[in-house]
Amino acid sequence: MILGLDTELSEKDVNPIGDKQIFFDGNCLNIVSKQSVLLTLPNLWLRDNCLCDECRNVETEEKSFILSTVSCDLTPSMVDLTEDMLSIGWPDGHQSDYVLADILELSKERHAPTMSWGKGFQPEYVNWSSFLADDATALIALTAFLQTGVMIIDGAPSQSNSLELLASRLGPIREVLFDRIHNVCLETRVYNVAHTALALPPHNDFASYSFPPSAQALHMLENGAEKGSSIILDAWAVAEKIRRQRPDFFTTLCDFAVPFRQFDEDNETYAVEPIIKCDSGGNIISVRFSNQLMQAIDPMRTGVNDFYQAYHCLCCHMTDSDNHVKFRLEGGHILLVAAHRVLHAREAFVPSGKRHLQDAYFELDNIANKVITLNKYKAALYDG
C-alpha cells in the first residue's frame, strides 16, 4: 500500500498496513505494531541513511550523501510499507528503501556486555601456542577478555620482546615514551616505583596521557623472588559501588579534573583529567587512578575539599583487599588487562632471585576488531 503525502499530516493521520500502522508526528515517522511503537524515524535520519548507490560509494560502502544538501524541514512525499520493506519518496524525486529488520538491528550491541567478576573470580588462562595458532581458541579468549577485562596467557617464551608476537592477535603495540617494551626489574634505571622491590598500589599506567593506553600486557620472563603477588582490581565495579552509595562523590569524581605527571631525564607527560569518565548514556568507560603519578592540586581551586572527600572514599575502596584478586605471575605468564577498567598492583617482594617483567601497551579497539574479523571468518567457514 502506498500513502501519498500531498497535504500536511498530523499524528491523527494513520495508515494501517497489515499488522503495522504509520503515524506522522512532527518531523518523524512512527511505525506502530500491536499497539506499541516499533520505530520512530526522524525524516532527516531517513534521508541521511539512504543506502542507494547514489547516496553511498559502491566501491568503499561509505556514505557520499551529505545532509546539508536538503532542507532541515524535509518531509516525505510518499511512503510505502510492504511487509518488512519501507520505501520513501522525497520531494526532489529521490527514493529511499529500508529493511525494517536492518534498522532494528542497530539497537543491538556490537559486542557482548561487560561482566562483573563476582565473588571468587580468577582470570581465565589460555595457552600461548594455542592462542596464536588456533583462531577458535583466540576468538573464545578475546571474547571473554572484552567481557571481563582480564586474562592470563601461559606458556609464553622467556625471550625478551616476545610481546611483539602478540600483534597478530591484539593489533600493533601502542608506542609511548619511556621505551616501546618496558623492562621492570631491579637492574634497570629507576624512574618509577615499579622498578623497586616495594609494594605497588593499584593503578593504571600512563594516567599522565590525555588518552592512556587502553590495554596492557605484562609478561613475566622470570620470577625467582619471594612474595610479590600480583593483584588486579575491577575499578568500574568500585566506581559503580560509589555511585550507588554516594552519588555526590561519584559526580565529583566525574567532574573534577586532576593533574597527573610521569617523567624522567628525557621525557615528560602531563594530563589534567577527571578520575572517572562516562559515555553519553552514563555508562562508565574509564577510571584513571595512579597515586604515584597524581600531582598536587591548587588548594584554592573551587571544589577541592569536596574532591578530597570523594577521593578519600575512592582510595579506601581501591586499597580494600576485599576488592582485590590476587595470584602469582610465574615465568611464562602474560597478564593482559583492559587498562581503562582493570587496575593492577603488586605486593612487595624479597629479591632472593631474579624477577624480570616486560610490559607493552595495546588498544582495546584493535582487540575488538580482532574479535569482529575472527567472527566473520568463522561465519564464512560455516557458510562455505
Residue ranges and their predicted role:
Residues 1-134:
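Motif-centric detector for short Cys/His coordination patterns
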Residues 9, 109-140, 144-150, 155-156, ...:
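Active-site environment of non-heme Fe oxygenases that use a 2-His-1-carboxylate facial triad
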